[in-house]
Regions:
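Short hydrophobic beta-strand element within catalytic cores of glycosyltransferases
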Residues: 287-290
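Aromatic "clamp/platform" in nucleotide-sugar-dependent glycosyltransferases that forms part
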Residues: 270
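Membrane-proximal helix-turn-helix segments that form the acceptor-binding/catalytic region
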Residues: 61-64, 117-140
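Conserved donor-binding/catalytic core segment of Leloir-type glycosyltransferases
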Residues: 180-198, 204-207
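Short alpha-helical donor nucleotide-sugar binding micro-motif in glycosyltransferases
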Residues: 249, 257-262
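Nucleotide-activated donor-binding/catalytic signature segment of Leloir-type glycosyltransferases, i.e.
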Residues: 229-253
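Carbohydrate-associated surface elements
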Residues: 146, 168
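A conserved catalytic-core segment of Leloir-type glycosyltransferases
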Residues: 2-58
Length: 290
């Protein structure tokens, strides 16, 4: 993360299963004597996402041993079971951007076969934990009024436990371009994950029609290039590889430059708790379709 000089980063150790494609090499007989690490390895290898659970276990152990160093804990939607113990240790506020049940439902609706549905169910195996934990939290922060409504509905949280604090855009960084840097016919979009919720496939499906009227159109996607997914297959089938570029692992300043170089921004998301991409585009003075 990009941190201010005054902010200390404390890294909680993990196996780093999502930092490598060769996950088999992370296995060793030592894992047999480290139950949490073994659980993490087995869960990932069988298509699950254990991090909300395993992170919670590890961070609780750290906070229990270093309680005196902290005044308040802010959790960014891990919604791990250990939060219920942490809020007994220290004052705790939890941010929920939106209930991930929304992501899961959209994935199930867009699944084309039983394998994809089974895969989505396995990946989202942390949802029962989140549904159990959320109603028991003392204070929740969410990022928009619609998000609050969905948290109440999906997680059965009492309305008076939730405070709406809108996400902020750094308007000293995301500013209109001071120069004429716009490149004609360039569209920009954001896709922080290759999931149906982001709606990227709908924008890609529209590109052939756009190209009929604006043949020099290009699309810049702020996000990782998908591999072996519906979106990647769609790009290949429509022969759009030459006009679509993906940008990931870049700084906020580089993101601002990309907005400045774009003629229009399109945010095709089916659902967002807040929608940073739309806010950033508007702050940069880029015409927006969302």
């Amino acid at each position: 993360p990009e941190l201010h000089d005054s902010v200390q980063l404390i890294q909680i150790p993990s196996l780093g299963m999502f930092e490598t494609e060769d996950r088999m090499k992370l296995f060793s007989l030592k894992l047999l004597f480290r139950p949490l690490d073994l659980y993490e390895w087995i869960t990932v290898m069988t298509g699950g996402f254990p991090e909300p659970y395993t992170y919670g276990k590890r961070v609780y152990k750290y906070l229990k041993n270093n309680k005196k160093d902290f005044d308040i804990i802010l959790d960014n939607q891990s919604l791990c079971g250990s939060l219920l113990k942490i809020q007994d240790l220290l004052p705790l506020a939890v941010t929920i951007h939106h209930p991930i049940t929304k992501d899961h439902k959209l994935e199930m609706q867009n699944a084309s076969n039983w394998k994809e549905r089974l895969s989505s169910m396995r990946w989202h195996n942390f949802l029962p934990m989140q549904k159990r934990v959320a109603p028991k939290l003392n204070k929740i922060i969410c990022v928009s009024a619609p998000s609050k409504e969905d948290i109440v509905k999906e997680f059965l949280v009492e309305d008076n436990k939730i405070e709406v604090i809108l996400n902020g855009i750094d308007i000293n960084r995301f500013v209109p371009s001071p120069s004429d840097s716009v490149k004609a016919n360039r569209i920009i979009t954001t896709a922080s994950a290759d999931i149906p919720l982001k709606g990227l496939k709908y924008l890609i499906q529209a590109l052939p029609e756009i190209l009929k009227s604006f043949p020099k159109t290009t699309l810049t996607v702020i996000g990782k290039a998908p591999s072996n997914s519906e979106v990647s297959k769609l790009i290949s089938n429509l022969d759009l590889k030459e006009i679509i570029s993906f940008k990931s692992g870049i700084s906020e300043n580089e993101i601002v430059d990309l907005y400045h170089a774009s003629e229009i921004a399109v945010i095709p998301s089916l659902y967002e708790g807040f929608g940073f991409g739309a806010g950033e585009a508007m702050a940069c003075g880029v015409p927006l379709i969302s």
